[in-house]
Amino acid sequence: MKKHIAMLCAVLLTALAAFAPGAAAAGPALTATEAYCIIDADTGLVLAQQNMNEELHPASITKVMTLGLACEKAQGKWDNVKLTVSHEDVYSLAGTDSSHIALQEGEEVPLTDALYATMMASANDGANLLAEYFGGGSIEGGVAAMNAQAKELGLEHTHFANPHGISDEDHYTSCYDMAQILRWALTQPGFETLFTRNEMYTMGPTNVQPVTRYFHQQDKMRVGSSRYYIPAILGSKIGYTNIARYSYVCLAEQNGVRLICVTMQSQIKTDKYNDVRTLLDDAFARYTGYTEIPAQGVTGELEVAGGGSTLGTVTVSDPGVKLLLADGLTAADVSVTLELPEQYLLGVDPAVYAVYTIHGRDVQETASVRVPAAVTGLEELLAKSANATLPASRDVGPKRIAGGLLAISVGATVLAALAAFGVVRLRIKWKKGKSRSKH
């Protein structure tokens, strides 16, 4: 146990060091933009940042979370889903002078239209409608779901007060948190298609609105004829309020390297355009491909328990990983530790991780990334325990009955864990297959 605690403490100290105020900032120093963060879209690794944990008003980039939760609920089944506009969807925005698509109370809106209206037209009434969709019928329920998702993602500098981003003292996020929100949202069915659409979207007439509505993506950095055009940007969400100033989040890709870039509190629109270009040009110049970090042979023993007894131990090790390293850094600049619980209890997903820390010196942000660790011996241990605790039926006395019941309980738990472990292995394999590791 002491070994596991010491190992966990080492990981925590590494994580704290990664984001300590004295850590060298490897990216450009911006003056017209208050904060930014660039991460690897595949691993979530922080590559460059300035004030990335500062809590700021996000404006409409809030809608990344709103859209992500709507896509999660729909699971790709957008067709034939209609949402009915409530009184609150419309009239809670009265006097805000906010962006909208003139939804009317009682209007029946296809889910697909609501998604594209919220994404492309930045419709606050559309965001309200979506919040009711995934929030159990109320905007308040949707906001609660947004905060619950932020907590699940481990975000410490985010709190939502609404689903659209109108400024509120209790509505804030950070560049780091927003980058991780987008990274999560990109895993939801249909979100990336929604986020990266450049073509005009047409919303047909509804039961109360006879006219056709047209939505255009509003980011000049994605318009080929614009002087601000950046071809690497695949998708983006823009935001603005008088308090928040200009906020921005995008997914960009160049030569197989996928980055998420967030900027907040750019003072004027041209500051945002110029600073995003500066950040992406710098990042793509520094990070030209993924480096294979082979398994380092770091191992640990993890106790396995079930049914009130200890079943044995398994071996946990670092699996190796592909990381974005700045030019000038090699695998020798990466260290690895293991993050293990004190005990693995059957029936619960084994929360075991390898933590890779990049020691970036003055060319890359010093930061860490967690990946699922490799576990060996668990299937064999579970199979052995299942066989050992399920004896053939025989006459037993009262004491043996109690022992037999315990054995059956352990055996049932083990069998359930075998099935669960299969699911865990499939889940980890699926996640690895889904992530885009480019070379």
Q: What do these predicted regions represent?
A:
Residues 4-24, 406-425:
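Sec-dependent N-terminal signal peptides of Gram-positive bacterial secreted proteins and lipoproteins
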Residues 22-176, 180-189:
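Active-site-adjacent loops and short helices of periplasmic peptidoglycan-processing enzymes
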Residues 15-16, 76, 206:
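Residues in and immediately flanking transmembrane alpha helices
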Residues 18, 74, 247, 316, ...:
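Ubiquitous "structural anchor" signal
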